């Protein structure tokens, strides 16, 4: 599929991000490191797309099967409210997103990136927190310093969660709420938030299925396709009727042809 020509503005200035990183490092938190984990190779990533609540029964079935459940940002509180305390919570965003983790619990390991704001770490005091660093070109790497594992990947928390899962040894990913598009009524998240400026995106060429996305969603869809260039041994089951699920459907169809 032809990549879109998109320009997006990343959140946070270089000065803000470096300040956040230095603040996080000063806290002496344990950091994400490569480690073997006992599992069956499957991991479940739950993001905040509008279709996610429709699949809560499937998510609960994964929990009963003993598969790790990862909440991406605001998906945390929905899962907790529905009886699924996530095993991990992952956030890359340098903006304060603590409004999505109001139902903190003692089971979840909270994994904010070092570029997240100090307010996030202050809020998580007393909880199980595992620090990780996101790779980025420029001064952020200087702020992180040498000898640190930095996780590369796309520009969203959801895509970095895939890379973290890969580093931890998982190869089979089930995705919920990775719609990366607006619902027909303009809703972009399960919380009912509406999208701003949007564009139409076609999967499989101009005669393919059309999706409406904001720029960040379209960029995420582009970056998602690059996962397979660097992690060719993964399998992805993207659940729901969204853009990323359609990309996977077309990809699998072409692969089988």
Please state what every model-predicted region is:
Residues 1-257:
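Metal-ion/cofactor- or nucleotide/acyl-coenzyme-handling active-site neighborhoods
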């Amino acid at each position: 599929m032809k990549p879109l020509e998109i320009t997006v503005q990343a959140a946070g200035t270089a000065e803000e991000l470096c300040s956040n990183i230095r603040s996080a490092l000063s806290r002496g938190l344990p950091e994400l490191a490569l480690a073997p984990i006992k599992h069956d190779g499957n991991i479940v990533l739950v993001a905040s797309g509008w279709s996610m609540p429709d699949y809560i029964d499937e998510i609960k079935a994964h929990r009963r099967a003993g598969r790790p459940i990862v909440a991406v940002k605001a998906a945390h509180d929905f899962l907790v409210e529905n009886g699924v305390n996530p095993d991990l919570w992952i956030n890359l965003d340098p903006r304060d997103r603590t409004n999505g983790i109001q139902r903190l619990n003692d089971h979840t390991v909270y994994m904010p990136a070092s570029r997240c704001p100090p307010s996030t770490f202050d809020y998580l005091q007393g909880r199980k927190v595992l620090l990780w660093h996101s790779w980025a070109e420029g001064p952020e790497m200087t702020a992180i310093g040498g000898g640190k594992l930095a996780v590369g990947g796309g520009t969203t928390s959801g895509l970095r969660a895939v890379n973290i899962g890969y580093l931890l040894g998982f190869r089979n990913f089930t995705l919920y709420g990775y719609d990366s598009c607006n619902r027909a009524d303009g809703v972009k998240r399960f919380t009912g938030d509406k999208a701003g400026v949007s564009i139409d995106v076609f999967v499989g060429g101009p005669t393919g299925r059309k999706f409406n996305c904001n720029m960040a969603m379209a960029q995420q869809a582009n970056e998602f396709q690059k996962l397979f260039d660097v992690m060719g041994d993964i399998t992805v089951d993207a659940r729901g009727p969204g853009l990323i699920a359609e990309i996977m459907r077309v990809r699998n169809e072409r692969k089988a042809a």
